[in-house]
Amino acid sequence: MEDSPTQSHVLQLAHPPIPIVRIGIIGLGNRGLLTLQRYLQIEGTEIKALSEIREGNLNKAQLILKEAKHPEATGYTGPGGWRKMCECNDLDLIFICTDWLTHTPMATYAMECGKHVAIEVPAAMNIAECWQLVDTAEKTRRHCIMLENCCYDPFALTTLEMARQGVLGEIMHVEGAYIHDLRSMYFAEESEGGYHNHWGKRYSIEHTGNPYPTHGLGPACQILDIHRNDRMEYLVSMSTHQAGMSEYARKRFGENSPEARQKYKLGDVNTTLIHTAKGKTIMLQYNVSTPRPYSRLQTVCGTLGFAQKYPVPCIALDSHGDTPLEGEALETVLTRYKHPFSATIGEEAHRKGLPNEMNYVMDYRLIYCLRNGLPLDMDVYDAAEWSCITELSEKSVLNGSIPVEIPDFTRGVWKKHKH
């Protein structure tokens, strides 16, 4: 479907500069409170409003502001408090840090109220919600960014820089993943930072496929210029059966415990293969219920080079044969192609002693672009494309791993657009 006369694409959308970005945050659980603390470190921001259904969490947030010597924010409580916050006229940007199922409804309402939105991952849970985000962003001409911090991983940025400079040749295949042993977390209480009786755990009881694709997929799509010179066309997906969560529960709680008897639809390991319009491939994995060491893979295969972050950073260049670079040779390449974001903003994060460089670079770039009237690094099409894999991977798994088409959320504009 092409753009209609009354609604056009928002690729490279830019707005007049906002000197001080006035921020509201919806959701002040663990993620929301961390978001609040992060943006107190970013110049040119003002935390104006906070919305949370649990008054105790709202009080925690106000205390964080007080201890940082910032003014108290306007607080909104109750089930409808977030709507009232979206409707106020003294906010520019709203962060949505709530459970997955509320991301899209809140984001679309905020945009309809004239606000830019930044959504925690994933931005949407199904194709219908992905289209709602795209259509609303196009109709309202508001920024809609999904906060995928893994796109700002220093190694991912280095390989992106190498690809942009042609060092890796034509990029043919990319791999990404979310591999993280969360078994103990799934049986820990929320007060302990866990997910017992948490919406994330409930999702694994009711669904299969890949419910959390964006950490691995975001950097992969950026290096392949998805919707900027190519697009994802279709996928096939398959999952193992589920055993890891049940076995862990039996050992910890006993054979006949409610935890051990709980059934899960989500397989232990999901693998999804994606084919692009220009003949490139992406392999995406999800695995949170085995003792497999943490990994996002971050594998890039080009005609002139290879790069992979996990389990240890590895680069091989055609000019050196197929032997991975080591020692000084590896450090020389990593230094030569260090992305400007890492060399400037990332180094600033280190000087400040901040614990997560990826978050700081992402946060800095978002506010920098808004303050300078620039297009954002990630747009609503990224949010839709990366999030839609949740529903589509499940559909493929449940139907014998059949190929499933991936919508073109740009309605054909990707053919005309270069990064």
From Swiss-Prot:
UniProt keyword Cell cycle present: no
Family: Belongs to the Gfo/Idh/MocA family. Glycosyl hydrolase 109 subfamily.
Cofactor(s) essential for the protein: NAD(+)
Record note on cofactor: Binds 1 NAD(+) per subunit. The NAD(+) cannot dissociate.
Residues annotated for substrate binding in this entry: 178, 212-215, 294
EC number: 3.2.1.-
Listed name of the protein: Glycosyl hydrolase family 109 protein 2
Native source species: Bacteroides thetaiotaomicron (strain ATCC 29148 / DSM 2079 / JCM 5827 / CCUG 10774 / NCTC 10582 / VPI-5482 / E50)
InterPro entries per UniProt: Gfo/Idh/MocA-like_OxRdtase_N, Gfo/Idh/MocA_oxidrdct_glycsds, Glyco_hydro_109_C, NAD(P)-bd_dom_sf
Keywords associated with the record: Glycosidase, Hydrolase, NAD
Gene Ontology MF: a single term: nucleotide binding
Binding-site list for NAD(+): 30-31, 52, 100-103, 120-121, 149, 195-199, 212
Superkingdom of origin organism: Bacteria
Function: Glycosidase.
